[in-house]
Amino acid sequence: MSLVLEVKTKNYLDDLLSIKKSLSHMETIVEEYNGYVLSESELKFGWTFFKLAFKPNLQNGIKEKFSDMLNKYPSSDQSQKFAKFMIDYFQSRGCAAIIKAND
């Protein structure tokens, strides 16, 4: 099953660009392209919300390439480990959006 992250931001254009650049970099590292889908954005109360869904090819490529790092996350749930890894990755690349795993 593909992971879906929920994203909320007050600076949609900057954070969207940051996420797209980060994902492009990740796709290059794992050599899997067109590996994600972004939903339409929705504006509520000054926040912009959208979802980021990973396609299996990119998700599996990341899991294989970064398995040692993913295993360091304390959760026994593999999808939660992957979500936390990606959230940390986006933050390390300068993304200021609030990101959480879709429950």
Q: Which sequence ranges carry the predicted segments?
A:
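Extended Gly/Ser/Thr-rich low-complexity repeat segments
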Residues: L17-H25, N60-F85, C95
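Short, extreme N-terminal segment that most often corresponds to the first beta-strand
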Residues: M1-L23
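Mixed-charge, Lys/Arg-enriched low-complexity segments
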Residues: K84-D103
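A general secondary-structure signal for short beta-strands and their flanking turns/coil
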Residues: M1-V4, F45-F49, S92
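Short secondary-structure junctions
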Residues: E27-Y36, F90-C95
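Ser/Thr- (and often Asn-) enriched beta-sheet segments in non-cytosolic proteins
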Residues: V4-K8, K51-A53, I98-K100
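Short, intrinsically disordered low-complexity segments
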Residues: E31-S76
